[in-house]
A protein has these predicted regions:
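Amphipathic, Lys/Arg-enriched alpha-helical "gate/interface" segment within cytosolic domains
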Residues: 2-122
Length: 122
């Protein structure tokens, strides 16, 4: 895992990359949050969707809700970057739409969009 700390808009943003899946369950999400907080002192994280288990995008597993609720509970804002058009589930599209209209969780196409979005939040 590689974590790069970026300052944008006066905010510290952690951009996490890896060649393997980092979030497979709630505990691995909590571990990632703790590592990022410790290494970067940031509560804003950008991750590529490839770092998430595919079961995250199957809402029937409830994994997305459980994981994202932890981010919200710990006041960590996260932007997930990737091409989400490959998923045909209307429920997932609605979930992404609602998340993008909130203040904590975002699904965006590019890393730069993610950094820009997280830097504009309070």
């Amino acid at each position: 895992m590689n974590i790069v700390k970026i300052e944008a808009g006066g905010k510290n943003i952690a951009v996490v990359s890896s060649s393997e899946i980092l979030i497979e369950d709630v505990q691995s999400a909590l571990d990632l949050m703790a590592t990022v907080q410790y290494e970067t002192d940031s509560n804003r994280i950008v991750i590529n969707k490839s770092l998430l288990s595919e079961s995250f995008f199957d809402l029937k597993t409830r994994l997305a809700g459980e994981i994202l609720q932890k981010f919200i509970n710990y006041r960590v804002k996260v932007a997930i970057v990737g091409d989400f058009s490959i998923y045909s589930s209307k429920s997932l599209r609605d979930f992404i739409y609602e998340s993008n209209n909130g203040n904590d969780i975002f699904f965006l196409a590019t890393e730069q969009q993610a950094i820009d979005k997280l830097s504009m939040l309070k």
